[in-house]
């Protein structure tokens, strides 16, 4: 997907005009209508951006399930997080370039994030935009960053990621180090040649993926408004603010976190903290068992709650910025954070007293956050009370079951020394 995005982006850049008066029409007319196959290249680039994030999210969650962030792959995981951050920056920079209504105002909101930094925030925002508002200097800078700087950085990070992968080897669904069991020639007993086994396997997966990919390219390039916002079919109007400003679908969960905390600085900290949690996974989960196959049932429940809460946040953010959606976003953010912060609980067997302490402390933290939100008049106390059951119920379910069924917190007693053919939850 990276190669496809670079190739299509190169052809789009040939015909694109980074000028506020020409940008929108260079996309709509020059690329979409006047250039041979320009519509196809543009649609492949738009759909490819979303497809890239789908693959990255699946790859990251697979790594979480099978413990690919644990020793000796901590550095490999951190490089992958940096790739994700660079990809997010690349997507944000490219979002402004069509100069549509949602592109303009979405970029205006994001560039204002840095103004939350005390003292130096406003000068940094002005330097980033090149002016007091988004205009020609901003568009030129974002175009150069999107076309040149970030692709080079992405390629460099991918290269370093592959070098690190070559040093430590890839993980597997069993979490077994195949290099610890070699034959007389030094070849891992469970190792197989890359060709034809991996090439045939990957060829099947790539073929199935491209069937879905090109269906969207030819039949639904806008993705029902998710891949390409409907407001971007109108040129940017700096005098008319849309009633609802939201990012593309792959950033919606983070937008819900940001929107759930009305204070700008704390909202940005909540948003940035989600990335920090991913980077801190090697420190939070220090259980020697890697794969989810051999972890406890409650650990599996917690790992399943991660993507579910992430998707729930995206669903909330897609709605209007009503007080109900803001409060729901706050509470689901608490669940998302909890799925990471309770990981140390599963590092070793816990006594009932320790489990009860974890439950009391976790519930206390949730209530302290809600009391603080009420104290700054962020949301009404009645609405907070009516919705506080969301994170409280999750924590009560997790630790309550640990108290009632201690066996559900224990990992498998037997760990294989060689690869097996079991399923995900084997």
Question: For each predicted feature, which ranges?
Answer:
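Membrane-embedded and interfacial regions of multi-pass energy-transducing membrane proteins
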Residues: 1-51, 55-426
